[in-house]
């Protein structure tokens, strides 16, 4: 049975993506793993918290998802992986929730996630990587 690896990608942070490439490639070679890439678009309440109204200021969610998928596909080209083993997912909502949901659904044997170095804000507020580590039902590799 092939392993399944979930790789959440923040399309707005290329430095984080660079950090996981070698780890994903190495893990994917084991048992010819299937690799699922995921990016998450914040939901509309997030945009409202930035002071944007629910109006023409906000692009349609379908447009946001299409653009995110296009960007994710460009990022995936940096990984040396067989294309028939790569899957692309774009979701809306809380990153940690969508990561955990997809990990259960596919089901993932491992999640490889990049994380910023911890600072006071991550200790006070928590981070997506920390939440994934705490709640995932599979192994999680956090790359810093």
Curated annotation (Swiss-Prot):
Domain of life according to the entry: Bacteria
InterPro entries assigned to the protein according to its UniProt record, in alphabetical order: Rossmann-like_a/b/a_fold, Universal_stress_UspA, UspA
A Pfam family hit: Usp
Gene3D superfamilies referenced in this protein's UniProt entry, alphabetically: HUPs
Self-association state and partner proteins as the record states: Homodimer.
Family: Belongs to the universal stress protein A family.
NCBIfam families: PRK15005.1 (NF011581)
Protein name as annotated: Universal stress protein F
Phylogenetic lineage: Bacteria, Pseudomonadati, Pseudomonadota, Gammaproteobacteria, Enterobacterales
Record gene name: uspF
């Amino acid at each position: 049975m092939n392993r399944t690896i979930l790789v959440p990608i923040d399309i707005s942070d290329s430095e984080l993506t660079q950090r996981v490439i070698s780890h994903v490639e190495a893990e994917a070679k084991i048992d010819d793993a299937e690799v699922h890439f995921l990016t998450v678009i914040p939901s509309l309440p997030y945009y409202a918290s930035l002071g944007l109204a629910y109006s023409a200021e906000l692009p349609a969610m379908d447009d946001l998802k299409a653009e995110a998928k296009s960007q994710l596909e460009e990022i995936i080209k940096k990984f040396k992986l067989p294309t028939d083993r790569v899957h692309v997912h774009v979701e809306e909502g809380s990153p940690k929730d969508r990561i955990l949901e997809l990990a259960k659904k596919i089901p993932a044997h491992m999640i490889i996630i990049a994380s910023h170095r911890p600072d006071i804000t991550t200790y006070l507020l928590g981070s997506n990587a920390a939440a994934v580590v705490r709640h995932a039902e599979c192994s999680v590799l956090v790359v810093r």
